[in-house]
């Protein structure tokens, strides 16, 4: 009877030690954090004017886009991490603004941001909530640009040779503020806000150009697992 009690006590002690060890090292050095969820990109547009020949004061606005997203984080120390956000391409519509406000959609594009972040996570490795700050770099690639008949009509395109749109891909810094909330010793909820000061140029096949500040704000929310 005594030997059974000692065995049970030893087992409970071992399990308790393991649980405490896991809690203490939930986001410790060497841990991998994988998450999945959604993200919205909201461009904060400051549009230049389209160069001639076109209507003076022609500008553009850009729609928000929401997509499935996630990311992978590696804890280099208990507080410093490397984060790789991941997402499907974001489709954005372009609309007339300025002197051509009200003409409707003039084009669309897919934005494919590739970002790597260095994060500093506050608090202890096993804390229930860990806010973090991140600084990184983003390569914003624009692909699958399409223009509409409206844009052709405004810029001198024809049905036979419609105006084609090209958006310059750019590299820009990205700032991040977020937080991770521990559900249990393996699962967590993660939310973050990013800001990227991004300026690019639209070039039309008819010769016009338009410089635009997109400066997108990204808002993400996901559920993740620790490994």
Model-derived regions: residue spans:
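Cleavable N-terminal export/targeting peptides
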Residues: 1-30
């Amino acid at each position: 009877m005594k030997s059974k009690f000692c065995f049970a006590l030893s087992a409970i002690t071992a399990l308790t030690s393991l649980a405490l060890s896991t809690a203490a090292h939930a986001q410790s050095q060497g841990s991998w954090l994988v998450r999945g969820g959604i993200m919205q990109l909201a461009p904060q547009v400051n549009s230049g004017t389209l160069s001639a020949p076109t209507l003076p004061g022609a500008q553009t606005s850009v729609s928000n886009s929401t997509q499935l997203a996630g990311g992978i984080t590696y804890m280099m120390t208990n507080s410093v991490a490397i984060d790789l956000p991941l997402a499907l391409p974001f489709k954005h519509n372009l609309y007339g603004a300025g002197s051509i406000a009200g003409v409707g959609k003039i084009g669309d594009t897919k934005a494919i941001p590739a970002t790597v972040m260095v994060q500093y996570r506050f608090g202890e490795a096993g804390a229930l909530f860990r806010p973090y700050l991140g600084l990184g770099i983003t390569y914003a690639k624009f692909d699958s640009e399409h223009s509409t008949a409206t844009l052709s009509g405004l810029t001198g395109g024809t049905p036979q040779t419609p105006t084609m749109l090209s958006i310059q891909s750019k590299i820009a810094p990205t700032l991040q503020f977020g937080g991770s909330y521990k559900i249990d010793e393996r699962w967590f909820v993660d939310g973050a806000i990013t800001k990227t000061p991004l300026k690019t140029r639209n070039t039309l096949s008819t010769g016009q150009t338009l410089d635009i500040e997109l400066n997108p704000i990204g808002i993400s929310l996901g559920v993740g697992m620790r490994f």
